Amino acid sequence: MIHTLETTVAGRKMKVDFGKTGMLSNAAIFMSYGDTVVMINANASKEPREGIDFFPLSVEYEERLYSVGKIPGGFIKREGKPSDKSILHARSIDRPLRPLFPKGYRNDVQIVNTVLSVEQDNLPEILAINGSSLALCLSSIPFTTPVAAVSVGLVDGEFIINPTVAQRENTILDLTVCATKERVMMVEAGGQEIDEETMYSAIMFGFEECKNIVAFQEEAVAKFGKTKNEPVLYKADEEVEKEVKSFAFDMIKEAMYIMDKDERNAQLDKVKEKISEEFSEKYEDKVADIAEVIYKTQKEIVRNMLLNEDRRPDGRAFDEVRPISCEVGILPRTHGTGLFTRGLTQVMTVATLGALGDVQILDGIAEEESKRYMHHYNFPSYSVGEVRPLRGPGRREIGHGALAERALEPLIPSQSEFPYTIRLVSEVLSSNGSTSQASVCGSTLALLDAGVPIKRPAAGIAMGLITSEDLEKEKVITDIQGIEDFFGDMDFKVAGTEKGITSIQFDTKIKGLSNSCVKDALEGAKKARLHILGKIKECIPEPRKELSKYAPRTEIICIDPEKIRDVIGAGGKVINKIIADTNVKIEIKEDGKIFVTSNNEPEGVKKAISIIEGLTKEVVQGEIYLGKVTKTTNFGAFVEILPGKEGLVHISKLDFARVEKVEDVVSVGDEILVKVTDIDNQGRINLSRKDAIAKKEEEKDK
């Protein structure tokens, strides 16, 4: 049976159909918002997966280019692997849902979001979060707490829910809020230096709208939801837990109170060896249970230390940032480098400048077609002292790279101010928490070192949270390190300048954050950010005045847009010849701006500009030009007076005396003065050498 429910969000209709498609899925829904349609399918395995210590949730977000009436580019002409944006959207769906599954649930769960139709006013990724939550709630999978999502914009001082394309062009804030009816679950934001009070108000504004969508989901579940399966939850054997904890608690506690990370880990390894010696024979088939008890004991000790003893594992105050060092220019041949170290977290970011033709071309469902500024993040195994194959960037690397990219994006100079493509690559050299925000700091250092005139330096910080089981008691922590992130309840990343916030990403391991926690985290992040910015400015207070000698050089000229075809030529013949002759890159914009770039040949840039200026310069009747003879005939000589512009000197106009043969006066390759005597209605140019000589003689007499 087909069921349909509707509600209104921001003045537009949100509709859900189920029972219409995917008859064999546990739950399959068609969800639409305006003309944007996403199909969501949710399924779970019947039995828990054995031999794992995590919840195997898989979220897929598939963009179909037919949704915007496009055929994929390239040779194959079909969608390939997920784009970076699809991966980011899948992660955004995963983060608010994962904490709401029962603890110990080990069944494989897959949620597939397929984008079928897109109206650019209504973002499919926002619809997919709502649809994924609703599909899970309608299914028999043990997920019972609905989550809603909205986008919030800020235009002319007014908050807007789910802004349209026109509104997004003018907004200074791009915020996504996910929440249950009681608490905020996840936030992602990019903004043009938004102050903390405004950001908090925007989050709360989105939270209120989320409550209405949650109510809509609850109504659907009450009417049409399936009976929930009783989950089989993993739990360590009670006898194993009791014996191992009794034997090892004090030893683990002693190890966890060691402030130095290497010493602490070494001591923990010794404790684990003792536990293994004690129980390996008795519980040889309970190895996973023993590991689970050790993990739970460590977690209990660290959380108690933070929550009840007001003590951090490394002895810092709760609002204290780890020791910071900054360096620039450490690589001799790159265009800009920054090395940022915060405690045991260290990131080196390298900036590379390129021509405008080096932009990244995007082939997706969004209207954006290219990207001039990009940031890539690499997290090799050696950064945590481990050994594993290097197989290219995973979802985490793509997500962290995008987060740091968003933090700097509002500060990047415009194309007219700085006519270069900019690529940043952050190499994580050592990781002990908050590498994405260290990448923001490293990126700032690299951009300043490269001479990129960013508006202001930016820095990032990660805030953490520890809460009691009843959520009544909570402590916000500044600059979390690995152990606090691993055993804590929140990763609240905030980046920005001294003026305001440029990016936020936070998610939780619990069932949401209180409003006061959100506010405290924003204020704590501001204090820490200003401290870090001070350290960055001590290292390099402003962008370098000169680009690296190894960086390309770009010059800009402006021509009449009507003359663009003259520069390009038939089939690109003219522009390709200029590029080949001068060894430059040329980018032409529709408004007549031409960007000429060369890596190491400034003379090539000058020559190319001279040719382009000649091609676009108008031939003026009555003016005298120094031209080159390109061809002779029995009736005259053809002379090139400007690049690509030739005229005819009739044999009668070559000299004052009668000329019997053209070659008696001029030859191919000769440079001669000529005067433009006429330009006919077909654009043909008539020249006179005789009149040019006469005019020059006349000027001499004066």
Curated annotation (Swiss-Prot):
Pfam families per the UniProt record, alphabetical: KH_1, PNPase, RNase_PH, RNase_PH_C, S1
Record-level Gene Ontology MF annotations: 3'-5'-RNA exonuclease activity; magnesium ion binding; polyribonucleotide nucleotidyltransferase activity; RNA binding
Main location: cytoplasm
Reactions this protein catalyses: RNA(n+1) + phosphate = RNA(n) + a ribonucleoside 5'-diphosphate
Domain KH: 552-612
Signal peptide: none
Domain S1 motif: 622-690
Task of the protein: Involved in mRNA degradation. Catalyzes the phosphorolysis of single-stranded polyribonucleotides processively in the 3'- to 5'-direction.
Family annotation (HAMAP family): PNPase
PANTHER family: POLYRIBONUCLEOTIDE NUCLEOTIDYLTRANSFERASE, POLYRIBONUCLEOTIDE NUCLEOTIDYLTRANSFERASE 1, MITOCHONDRIAL
Name of the protein this chain belongs to: Polyribonucleotide nucleotidyltransferase
Organism of provenance: Clostridium botulinum (strain Hall / ATCC 3502 / NCTC 13319 / Type A)
Organismal lineage: Bacteria, Bacillati, Bacillota, Clostridia, Eubacteriales
Gene assigned in the entry: pnp
